[in-house]
């Protein structure tokens, strides 16, 4: 397994605990019976994998057991792993768009790790050899980060119209031939109508001023908020088209099951996971490795 998965096992977070619980349940059984199924179901639900997702995992597992005539509990683990990997794997859409120019809108509620994610994403794009510019309405943190990392930050004063910031950032990115423009957005979900109008306006500005640019809209969700992250995915998904999810704060949480739920319930690929505070701690989401982490591989 790669570095990111060892990060999880070091932390003994969600992965270690769920892995232990699953193997305890399976190893305690001499045969594959209804009691084993009930215990597995309970284990998944208590690991913050939602009820609906758990039901679809269990349904798939029962079919798999029947079709493959599985009678040994040890083989149940492999079947379970395949089913869970299938749920979170969205194929090619898992990758960040590699085209240039690219405009990335980053949305999510304040405090969920949005600003940090933007900084880490900019760092990642630069490491991949792409030129980067940031557009931010007020984030002082981003300005400091940009100065440290030699990335241009186009900003307006606190409370400025985000669309005006996007407009200026686009003009600057076009003039400099920048590969990737990453734009922050306001993080208020309280007033959905305002948020919707704001995002629509930003999208209209990009459509009009930068029609040749490829687009990504990334939703940042804090894994430690558990079920709240699911409702945020729903709310933001109703407001705008989301091309991918960034799941942050996965290093110290027992709530990692939320990744499985979000990937299953919404047709949105998880593109990145945040596994620490460091600049390198934004990892591409690799379904096999992520689920492998649960099964301690």
Label every model-predicted segment:
Residues 1-20:
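N-terminal accessory targeting/assembly segments
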Residues 16-174, 178-183:
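Primarily NTPase-proximal linker/entry elements flanking Walker-type ATP/GTP-binding cores
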Residues 141, 162-176, 190-296:
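Conserved catalytic-core segment of NTP-binding enzymes
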Residues 2-5, 33, 248:
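Generic N-terminal initiation segments characterized by hydrophobic and/or small/turn-forming residues
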Residues 2-3, 21, 27, 91, ...:
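Residue-level signal for pocket-adjacent positions within structured domains
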Residues 10, 21, 75, 289-290:
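Exposed alpha-helical structural elements
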Residues 186-188:
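Short glycine-rich anion-binding loops that position phosphate/pyrophosphate groups of nucleotides
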């Amino acid at each position: 397994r790669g570095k990111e998965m060892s990060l999880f096992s070091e932390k003994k977070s969600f992965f270690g605990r769920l892995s232990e619980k699953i193997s305890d349940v399976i190893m305690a059984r001499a045969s594959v019976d209804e009691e084993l199924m009930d215990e597995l179901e309970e284990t998944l639900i208590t690991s913050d994998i939602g009820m609906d997702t758990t039901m679809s995992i269990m349904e798939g597992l029962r079919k798999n057991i029947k079709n493959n005539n599985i009678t040994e509990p040890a083989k149940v683990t492999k079947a379970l792993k395949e089913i869970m990997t299938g749920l979170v794997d969205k194929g090619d859409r898992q990758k960040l768009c590699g085209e240039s120019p690219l405009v990335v809108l980053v949305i999510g509620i304040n405090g969920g790790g949005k600003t940090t994610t933007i900084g880490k994403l900019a760092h990642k794009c630069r490491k991949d050899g792409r030129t980067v510019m940031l557009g931010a309405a007020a984030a002082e943190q981003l300005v400091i980060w940009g100065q440290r990392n030699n990335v241009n930050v186009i900003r307006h004063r606190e409370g400025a119209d985000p669309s005006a910031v996007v407009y200026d950032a686009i003009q600057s990115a076009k003039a400099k031939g920048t590969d990737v423009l990453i734009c922050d957005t306001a993080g208020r979900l309280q007033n959905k109508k305002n948020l919707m109008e704001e995002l629509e306006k930003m999208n209209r500005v990009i459509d009009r001023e930068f029609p040749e640019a490829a687009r990504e809209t990334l939703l940042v969700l804090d894994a430690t908020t558990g079920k709240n992250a699911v409702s945020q995915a729903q709310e933001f998904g109703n407001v705008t088209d989301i091309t991918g999810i960034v799941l942050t704060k996965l290093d110290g949480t027992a709530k990692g099951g939320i990744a499985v739920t979000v990937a299953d319930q919404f047709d949105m690929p998880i593109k990145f996971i945040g596994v620490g505070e460091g600049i390198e701690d934004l990892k591409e989401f690799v379904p096999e490795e992520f689920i492998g982490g649960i099964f301690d591989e």
